[in-house]
Amino acid sequence: MSHAPTGAERAAFHQMKDGTAEDWAIIGRHFQPLAEGLTDRVLAHLKLLAGDHGGFAVDRLTHSLQTATLALEDGRDEDYVVCALVHDVGDVLAPINHPEIGAAIVRPYVSEKLHWILAHHGIFQGYYFWHHIGLDRNARDAYRDHPHFEACACLLYTSPSPRDQRGSRMPSSA
């Protein structure tokens, strides 16, 4: 019997080895609403990027919206646009390895190629500025033979404040 979980409904075990089928059925009933709420949680987390400029010309939310808008206007598919939107969602939680956060969120839903691009966009962007901060701008070359290297190296949407020469309807602020 499947039903919505109640707040009081809990598994009885304290160690996973002691879980029963009923315990796991209870946990499963709690998991479904959690999984179904992912989009709302990601959008709420994106809003945390508002006002966080990090020294850039626009805040991180505006940058994310601009990036997704450019991808949409370029005719990219829905998965690509979503990846463009969430590519920096991890900035607040994990600034050093933020690309891995967005990539982990979308991994079950997008192609291996899009997941790879999202997971590696940070090291590829490093090409444009790492030499200014004492890092190896060519670190991305470790992936030169990877089939998605060229797709990730593309500069189409990588600027903190992307400017579209074609008269985009990009938001200038969030």
Q: Where does each model-flagged region fall?
A:
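Acidic/His-rich, divalent-metal-binding segments that scaffold phosphate/diphosphate chemistry
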Residues: M1-A94
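Conserved small/polar residues in nucleotide/adenosyl-binding loops
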Residues: Y157-D164
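Divalent metal-dependent catalytic cores for phosphoryl transfer on phosphate-bearing substrates
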Residues: T62, A68-L156
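Hydrophobic alpha-helical segments, chiefly the membrane-spanning helices
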Residues: M170-S173
